[in-house]
Amino acid sequence: MSGHHAYQMYAHVTWHTWKRVGCVDAAAAIDVRSAVASACQATGVRVFRDAVLANHVHPVVSFRPDIRLSDFVRLAKSVAATRVSRRVTGTVRWARGYFVTTIHKRDLSRATRYVADQFQRHPDLIPRNSRRPGML
C-alpha cells in the first residue's frame, strides 16, 4: 500500500454562547481566536477564515479524514472559556453542541467570504471593549 494520501475536506463550523448572550468582548475575542489556533495545532485542523462575534464563532476549516471535528470544537471551546476566565471568572459560557456543514472545494471561496462578511452582516455583534474594567 502506498504512503500517498490526498484529501480535500472542508467545513464551516459554528458554535454560540449560552442562550446567545453577547458576552464576548474585544479582549475575549482575542482569547477565543488564540484558543481556536491552539485547538488547530493540537488536532491538525487548519483554519482558512474565522470570525469571532459577541455571541458566536465561525471558523472555515480543512481537516484530514482521520480527524474528528468534535474533538477540535470541544478543545477550542474549552480552551477559550479557560483563557477568558483567567481574566474574569465565568464570563464566557458556551452552549452545548455546534453546527457543521461540509463545503465542496468549489464553494470554499464563497464560504470564506461569508465568514469574512460577518461584521458587516451583524454590526451589532462586533466584540467591543468592555465598558467596566474587568467586566464583559
Please name every model-derived segment.
Residues 1-136:
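Basic nucleic-acid-binding interfaces
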